[in-house]
Design a protein with these regions (language model features):
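Short alpha-helical transmembrane segments in multi-pass integral membrane proteins
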Residues: 1-24, 83-148, 192-248, 304-369, ...
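Helix-terminus/linker motif at the lipid-water interface of multi-pass membrane proteins
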Residues: 32, 36-55, 125-132, 188-195, ...
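Transmembrane helical elements of multi-pass membrane transporters/channels
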Residues: 22-41, 144, 155, 178, ...
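Small-residue hotspots at the loop-to-helix junctions and early N-terminal turns
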Residues: 49-63, 138, 142, 201, ...
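Residue-level signal for short hydrophobic patches within transmembrane helices
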Residues: 13, 17-36, 40, 64-71, ...
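Small-residue-rich hydrophobic transmembrane alpha-helices
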Residues: 54-115, 152-171, 278-342, 373-396
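Short runs within selected transmembrane alpha-helices of multi-pass transporters and secretion channels
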Residues: 76, 145-163, 171-179, 200-213, ...
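Hydrophobic transmembrane alpha-helices of multi-pass small-molecule transporters
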Residues: 66-67, 182-186, 212-216, 288-291, ...
Length: 447
């Protein structure tokens, strides 16, 4: 049964470029604080504990966490898409069922991932060629992190659902609070109590717990179409099937993407601690660009989902064109900034000259190709907003993941070295971007 509202939905009715920016800025600020939230551990550990600890909380550890968390968040994104569509159609009953199913999925999934992550952490780190001197701290960090994975899942799902219905401000406010808390706890646990890597992990888990509580409370207090009742959290068959149908390909795509990064990480680990530390620091700097590109992707997915649900296909296509234009400008700005100020950014993490030189080499190889990923991120987001997830998954898994692994296996041995490994990124981005452009043009002509 559909429910009418008296207020105007600006996503389906307002001036597109203006509403896209109004929606985008809270997301990008939220993503910025999410990165600051994650980077605080890295900066404080790198500056006050040492490069070995820096490599322990980044490198292989970060890749494994991204792999497992990325699969679940990708899977749960199915709820975000269907809630966005039902919300655009003002279908309260299905919005409600999708919301409670998503929370049930988060709880059950977190229990499974906690047990699995704690159990296989040492094995995963060993198969990634993690140096022996980093193994103990890396295992400790991973196990503490996975013990609190419930909070990661709840926050990510809850905040994504809020954004799906057009609320990008409250997730930002909650992240600001929790980011500040994380930094304060890092400083106390690492500098005062000298807890090292364990202190960084505990600070992260406690902060994530606060963010999960805040986003859950927001959904419980909402009196809009979207309202969470703890006693109603359960699996609804139709909602669960829709969540899996849309979310599973996205989860597989995320897993394959992170698995290919793990494959590259394993290759980089053979170069030693300096390269691992440089890759960890580069990852945090690189994330400054990805947070903006990802925010545009989230905005476009939400706008496409709601306009698709409302049957406004021309407006939906215009949202995509405007979003891509904005994201391309942003990619150019970041490339220039990184080339001019990259060395200063690396100094935030370490003063080790060898580590910084290696990091700058990585940055110079990857940053000029940022514009290519705009097409992958935004076009896959647009297609996902319409419920089309299978073909984008195949293109991403084949164009990025499979080709990247094949590059490491067949191309790197022909010219061994760091540059050859890193060059796999722009090559696979180019191929995948071309595939997405062709498919999107064909698909949009059918609407």
């Amino acid at each position: 049964m559909k429910q009418e509202t008296t207020s105007t939905n600006q996503i389906t009715e307002g001036v597109i470029w203006k509403q896209l920016l109004l929606f985008f800025f809270p997301i990008v600020m939220g993503t910025f604080f999410q990165q600051l939230y994650n980077t605080a551990d890295t900066v404080i550990v790198g500056r006050f504990v040492g490069k070995e600890a820096l490599a322990s909380v980044g490198g292989s550890t970060a890749q494994i966490v991204n792999l497992i968390v990325g699969f679940f968040v990708g899977l749960a994104s199915g709820a975000t898409v269907i809630i966005s569509q039902f919300y655009g159609a003002q279908d309260k009953r299905n919005v409600d069922r999708s919301l409670h199913t998503a929370f049930a999925f988060s709880i059950v999934g977190s229990v499974f991932i906690t047990i699995l992550g704690i159990a296989i952490a040492p094995w995963l780190l060993k198969i990634m060629n993690t140096p022996e001197n980093l193994l103990t701290d890396s295992v400790l960090y991973m196990r503490i992190y996975f013990a609190g994975i419930l909070f990661v899942f709840i926050y990510n799902v809850g905040s994504s659902i809020l954004r799906a219905v057009g609320d990008s401000k409250r997730p930002l406010y909650y992240l600001i609070v929790c980011c500040i808390l994380n930094i304060v706890l890092d400083l106390i646990l690492i500098l005062v109590f000298h807890m090292g890597v364990a202190g960084a992990a505990i600070a992260t888990v406690v902060s994530q717990a606060v963010s999960a509580i805040l986003v859950t409370r927001a959904l419980m207090k909402s009196d809009d179409l979207l309202h969470l009742e703890l006693k109603e959290i359960r699996f609804y068959k139709a909602a669960l099937l829709s969540l899996i149908w849309i979310g599973l390909p996205t989860g597989i795509q995320s897993t394959m993407y992170n698995a290919s990064n793990m494959f590259i990480q394993a290759s980089l680990n053979t170069f030693g601690t300096d390269t691992m530390a440089a890759w960890t620091a580069f990852g945090k700097i690189d994330a400054l660009y990805w947070m903006v590109n990802s925010a545009f992707g989230i905005a476009v997915t939400t706008f496409v989902g709601q306009n698709y649900g409302a049957g406004k296909y021309d407006r939906m296509k215009k949202c995509v064109r405007i979003g891509i234009s904005m994201a391309l400008i942003a990619s150019l700005i970041f490339t220039i900034i990184f080339f001019l100020g990259g060395r200063s950014l690396f100094h935030l993490f370490t003063d080790d000259t060898a580590v910084i030189d290696i990091g700058m080499q990585m940055l110079h190889l990857i940053a000029p190709s940022y514009f290519l990923f705009v097409f992958i991120e935004l076009l896959s987001g647009a297609l996902r907003g319409t419920g089309d997830v299978i073909i984008p998954m195949i293109m991403t898994c084949g164009g990025i993941c499979l080709l990247r692994v094949l590059w490491i296996i067949f191309i790197v041995p022909l010219k061994p070295g760091l540059e050859t490994i890193i060059f796999s990124y722009p090559v696979t981005w180019f191929i995948t971007a071309v595939l997405f452009i062709i498919y999107y043009i064909w698909k949009s002509r059918k609407l």
